Structures are given as C-alpha cells and as structure tokens.
Amino acid sequence: IIGAGYIGLEVAATAVQKGLKVTIVEMADRVMNRTVDPVISEYFDNLHRTNGVEIFLESALERFEGESGVEKVICTNNKTVEADGVVVGVGILPNQEIAESAGLKCNNGILVDEYGRTEDHSIFACGDCTNHPNFYMKKNIRLESVHNALEQAKTVALSLMGKPEKYNQVPWFWSDQYKDKLQIVGMSGDHDETVTRGSIEAGTFMLFYLKKGELIAVDSVNNPKDFLISKKLV
C-alpha cells in the first residue's frame, strides 16, 4: 500500500483481516501525518504493526517493476518490496477542469461562497472539489470528507429552492481500523495546549486541543459516547 493516510490504513486493516500480508510505504515520518497529532499516529502505527503490517516510513515510491503486472515496488531509499497487488492512496487533486473550461475561478478546487455559488451565481458546486469559506476555520478550505459533502449538498439544494442558508458546519471525520474507531471534530494544528483524557495504553482515550483556552478540536479513540458530547462543545 502506497500511503499511510486514512485510505491506506483502512485498506491495510481490511486486507489483514482477510488474511493478506501487507506492507505500507509512506514518505512522511509518521502515519496520518497531515491530519492527526503524533500521539494518534503512534497509537495507530503500533496497532498496525501489532497486527503484522510492515510499515516503511520516510520511504517514497520510485517505480514499479514487473513483467505482466506489478511484482516489485522500488522505493527511493533503496528498499524493495515484493508485491502481487498494489493500492495507491496518496491524496487527490480536485476535478475542476469543467469549471475552468466554463471560465469559473478555481484555486485548489472550485471556488464557491457560503451558499455553494460559484463566481457565476447560476452555477453551484459542492463536495470534495470545492474550496469554500468556513466560519469555524475563519478562512477558505477544501475538505475531503463524507460529512462535508453531505452538508454542502444540503446547502446547495436549499439555494436552488430559493431558501438559501449559509453553510455553517464544524468539520468532523471518522476512521474504522480493525476494531478501533477514530473520531475527529474540528481541526487541530493551530492549538497551544493539549489535554489527554482516558488511557492510551487501554486503547480508550481522547485528546482535547485548545487555543487560548478555547476548545478547537477533539480526537477520540474508541469513545463514541463522549465524542458525541465533545462535538457540541467545539
């Protein structure tokens, strides 16, 4: 598996449970590097290694080799992985070509306002391909998540029916790996304090991220009830 983000790790967990031998190649220095705190990365790294997954960190893909299909994965640090199947999960680029051809403004996605309208107010867009204003982040962002796609679709539908309501959602995400559930509300990274609740060793814990005393994000592992409460506090 190329990439140790949500997709790569979820596929790895499923493959292991189907009895397959799995190797992950990741160019960053930890799993889920772009989206979670190092504490969460370490927990899920250990979880996968405990389940028999081989993980090569700081290893970038150089090329594939094979006669009739992929037989070897060659990495830039001289590591070679024997393989009879490869899954690539390294992120996406938004499909914005149709918008560009229509003369609409794009910048890491199709630019829309809080009602889902593009530069041409007769054209709307929603989902992973849009770059939209987010009141919580206080800036424009492009999100790749089920929740965002669903809620943006509702916003666009209301606009089309002449009942416009501003998109007003705090981002949240989840990932199921083996029997473990990771749930996230808000986006950490800009915090100045972290509070841990529960037991990392027991596999049931939460990380609360604060900025100037205000709760801005929560990461929850195997604690769905408390997570539902936390969603209301961010």
Where are these regions (language model features)?
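Rossmann-like dinucleotide-binding cores of NAD(P)H-dependent redox enzymes
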Residues: Y6-R63, S145-N148, Q169-Q177
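Hydrophobic alpha-helical segments, especially N-terminal targeting/anchoring helices
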Residues: V25, I74, V112, Y209-K211
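Active-site- and interface-proximal helix/loop "cap" or "latch" segments in soluble metabolic
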Residues: S230-V234
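Mid-to-C-terminal Rossmann-like scaffold of FAD/NAD(P)H-dependent oxidoreductases
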Residues: C129-D226
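FAD-site-proximal beta/loop scaffold in flavoenzymes
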Residues: S68-I74, T80-L158
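Beta1/beta-strand and adjacent pyrophosphate-binding region of the FAD-binding site
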Residues: I1-G5
